[in-house]
Amino acid sequence: MCIFFFFKKLFFVEINVCLSFFFLFYFIFVLFFAAEVRNNDF
């Protein structure tokens, strides 16, 4: 039972890390896109 909870915790931590990376890349992409649009003056 202890091992099960340990793996469950590890799994959730892994998901949180993946989500953090996803949001980080999304944030960078949005900033880059906004800069491109501003430079092109649409």
UniProtKB/Swiss-Prot annotation:
One of its GO terms (cellular component) is membrane. It comes from the Eukaryota. It is found in: Membrane. Keywords: Membrane, Transmembrane, Transmembrane helix. It is a single-pass membrane protein. The chain crosses the membrane at residues 15-35. Its main location: membrane. This is Uncharacterized transmembrane protein DDB_G0286783. It comes from Dictyostelium discoideum.
